[in-house]
């Protein structure tokens, strides 16, 4: 591992600046899902146990360098206090300057301080060295626990990390270890499942994966584009016909790299995209001209079952069908439950990420069974694309 963790740092009596992700959904000024807040608790508690004083830095929404009251982190304070019962959590109405400096000076051991939205300063998203230096003045150690913001080179994620002794927080550490196990030095064979609507949004991902995995399963709307590239008609299905040449390039790149690509063998088609729509299962080559492909069929699921059973590592990003609408969630559900089963039996290391993916695995009741579920979205995708993440690179020893 090329980065320090909390275990490597002497925090006793030190002010620890912790970059966290508390970008939670709100309704009428109330937090509707506190998952991201709950995930930072182990890091905050470990810093407190080591005698450090945690000062939390975070962004909230997109205020574009201006103060926007509805995007004040003050709104998150009650949910944060609830997640840390028995710990006094205070708030400072800025993240640099006299107000946070005084609030930090007044902190007692065992207390936590939340600073105002870093994006209220235009310099945050520009990675302004002056803003990073003003933040660095507040503490002696920097901890990044926001993997989800690590793909952005901002003042609080990258600039600050280069000015103070730095380490990964517990959530960041867990994420990096899981991704290292899945793509860095994985146990082989490695299977990647990539679904979703469009090839165009996942070009870099597919291009990187064919050179790094043994099997690539392509599902969802993007599978239709690959079928079109092979001369198969897909009726009224979602397909990016202008991406057919690109799909053929990916297929030949995979062949050259010894990566087997798995496309649907049979498909579930319907004439309407709605819950409970009349549907039928047909061979992939037999999609009626007036129908659309909305899921992979049982033959495909059975074939994938064999691929999964032979694998040691699996990475999943994107559903295999239109999982939001029953019965077109069947292939995603069946595949996800099998991965969870193999993982629980100790036969597979499974890592999944991306918004739709997490929703699909939760819907299938399979999320708990995976080795690791990343909530990072864009950062998870960029890591899978093989890109260097500035927030992680800045922590590298």
UniProtKB/Swiss-Prot annotation:
Pathway: Carbohydrate degradation; glycolysis; pyruvate from D-glyceraldehyde 3-phosphate: step 2/5. GO terms for biological process: gluconeogenesis; glycolytic process. It comes from the Bacteria. It is found in: Cytoplasm. PROSITE patterns: PGLYCERATE_KINASE. Substrate binds at residues 21-23, 36, 59-62, 119, 152. It is an enzyme of class 2 (transferase). Pfam families: PGK. GO terms for molecular function: ADP binding; ATP binding; phosphoglycerate kinase activity. Gene3D superfamilies: Phosphoglycerate kinase, N-terminal domain. Keywords: ATP-binding, Cytoplasm, Glycolysis, Kinase, Nucleotide-binding, Transferase. It catalyses: (2R)-3-phosphoglycerate + ATP = (2R)-3-phospho-glyceroyl phosphate + ADP. Its EC number is 2.7.2.3. Monomer. This is Phosphoglycerate kinase. The gene is pgk.
